[in-house]
């Protein structure tokens, strides 16, 4: 969730770790 602070929603890979970090 630390990387989520960057809010890199513009990146394609961001959605991968963003969703995984939220659930895990």
From Swiss-Prot:
InterPro entries: Microvir_J-like (IPR006815). Pfam families: Microvir_J. The keyword DNA-binding applies. It is found in: Virion; Host cytoplasm. Coiled coil: none annotated. Transmembrane segments: none annotated. The keyword Transport does not apply. GO terms for molecular function: DNA binding. Interacts with F protein. Belongs to the microviridae J protein family. This is DNA-binding protein J. It comes from Escherichia phage alpha3 (Bacteriophage alpha-3). The lineage of its organism: Viruses, Monodnaviria, Sangervirae, Phixviricota, Malgrandaviricetes.
